[in-house]
Amino acid sequence: MQKSNSKFAVLPVMFGFFIMGFVDIVGVATSYVKADFAGMDDKVSGLISLSCFLWFLILSIPTGMLMNRIGRKKTVVVSFAITALAMLIPVLKYDFAFVLVAFAMLGIGNTMLQVALNPLVTNVVSAEKLTGTITLGQFIKAMSSFLGPILAAMFAGSVWGWKAIFPVYAAVTVLAMAWLAVSPIQEQLIEKSEITFARTFSLLRDKYIVLF
C-alpha cells in the first residue's frame, strides 16, 4: 500500500465490489422482460444474458491495456460511468432492443470493473491484508447479488414496477463513481509493456495454463 494513501481510501474501492454485484440482476431481469414482451421464447430471451456476459471474453485484455494507459482508478471510474448509463437506458426507452443495449453496456462496465478493481485494491491495503480484503470484497459482491432479486420483487409489487430497480442502481453507481473520483489514491507505476495481446496469448504455450 502506498504510504500516502489514507486508510479511508479503501472504502470507496470496496464499494466497487457492491457495484460489481449489479450484473447478476440479468438473471431475474430476463424473466421479467420475457413476461413484459408477450410471445418471446427462451432462445430470444437468452440473448439478454449473452449480450451481458459475452464481453468478459472480448474486453478483458483491452481493459488491461487501457488500465496500463490511464491507471487503475480511472478505469474503475469509467466502468462506473458505463454501468450508470446502462441502467438509465431502460428508464428512457423500454423495448427489447434497448434492453439488449442496456445489458450489453452493463456487461462492458462490469468487465472493466472486474479487471481493474482487484489491482486497485493493492494500492489501498498492505500486502498482509490483501487476501482478507479481497475476500471481504467478494462477500460484499455476493450480498449485492443477493439483494438484486429481492429489490426487483419488491418493486414489482409496487406502483413503479420492477423496472424501478434501474434508476436505483444508476443512482447508487453515480454515488460510487463520485466517491471514488474525489478520493486521492496514489497508484503504483505500471510498465507499459506489462499487458499486451502477444504476451497474453503467449501464455497458451504453457501446458499447465492450457490444462486449467
Residue ranges and their predicted role:
Residues 102-139:
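Cytoplasmic helix-loop-helix junction between adjacent transmembrane helices
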Residues 24, 52-61, 146:
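Residue-level signature of mid-helix packing/kink "hotspots" within the transmembrane helices
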Residues 97-103, 211-212:
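Short hydrophobic/alpha-helical segments at membrane-entry points of transmembrane helices
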Residues 58-97:
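Conserved MFS/SLC helix-loop-helix module at the cytosolic interface between two early adjacent transmembrane helices
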Residues 136-184:
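Helix-loop-helix hairpin linking two adjacent transmembrane segments in secondary transporters
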Residues 1-3, 188-212:
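Juxtamembrane intracellular "pre-TM" segments in multi-pass secondary transporters
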